[in-house]
Amino acid sequence: MYHFETLIAKSIFRGGGQFDHHQNHYQYFCIAAKRQKGISMNFMNNYNNTNPIIIGIDHGYGNIKTAHCCFKTGVAAYDKEPTFKSNLLVYEGRYYLIGEEHKEFISDKMTDSDYYILTLAAVARELNIRKLTSARVHLAAGLPLTWVSEQKDSFKEYLLQNDSADFAFKGVDYHVEFAGADIFPQGFSAVADKLREFKGTNMLCDIGNGTMNVMYINECRPLAKKCFTEKYGTNQCMLAVRENLMKQFGVSVDETVLERVIRHGTADISQRYLTAIRDTATEYAEGIFRRLREHEYDPELMRLYVVGGGSCILKNFGSYDKDRVVINDDICATAKGYELLAEQKQNRKGGIV
């Protein structure tokens, strides 16, 4: 717990855990204000020749998100060049199709090389947006709230296992030098630039593909001792939908159809299938609130802030007081938050070298 509190303190607080409204908070919102123009600060100026580009990456179980893009968390490896080359990454003599074969949930993201390969793909996408093929990069990433203390050092080592990487993605050659990495708490990072809105008692709920992370933020201060992680992400909702469709109709529906209904509330399918999917998603949304109540959520006493890719489920199928619940359905919000925290840390240190 100490490491987690220290991480929060380094990101947001100064001096005995007290919030510095005159310096850190102001500096933070200067960074955030510049971001409101639609792109990150380092996207606009790339700093200079000595400072690396900060790239925030949200390593989700369902999707990899950066500040500007999102793609499926899936890797299919080949020893020989595959027939279909869409989203093909070539690294150290092997071929990887990015976005293929949905990756199963694992609590330790460092058990294989998949997330490293996905990191390279994410970096390539961000560099492509900047029209760069060679760069020094500082990674800003994160882990679930209750895992960050124990895993952040090993995850940082995992991401920085090589000083540099030469690879090709979608037919373009890239050379990347890794200048460093910062690991922040998931969920919290998505709202770090909005802490001044968290007056009174607040509950933050980050719904991802594999996990649901819950955190209390009271009077603009995150409470390290009131953080919870549950294996109740959108993947559990998808599994429940599949099981219900098989039980009712004996059919297996393509995942893209299910995702469209969950994300948008509807799809071009018959009404009976649509109703079955909606009913199951509604039950899942009720399950989210049930679990929140187990962590003492009371809508009359606190506000609820929902972030993450699964926030669309509550938005489309949940029953709640819209005056007491704020839903941020920007799937890239956490990755943007990682960059903000890393930029703030850089400014405090006078620059990353």
Feature names for model-found ranges:
Residues Y2-L204, R221-Q236, Q248, T256-V353:
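Nucleotide/phosphate-binding catalytic cleft detector across ATP-hydrolyzing
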Residues T66, V214-Y216:
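Conserved blade-register residue in beta-propeller folds
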Residues I207-N213:
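Ser/Thr-glycine-rich phosphate-binding loops at phosphate-binding pockets of nucleotides
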Residues R242-Q248:
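Acidic, metal/cofactor-coordinating or nucleic-acid-engaging core segments within structured domains
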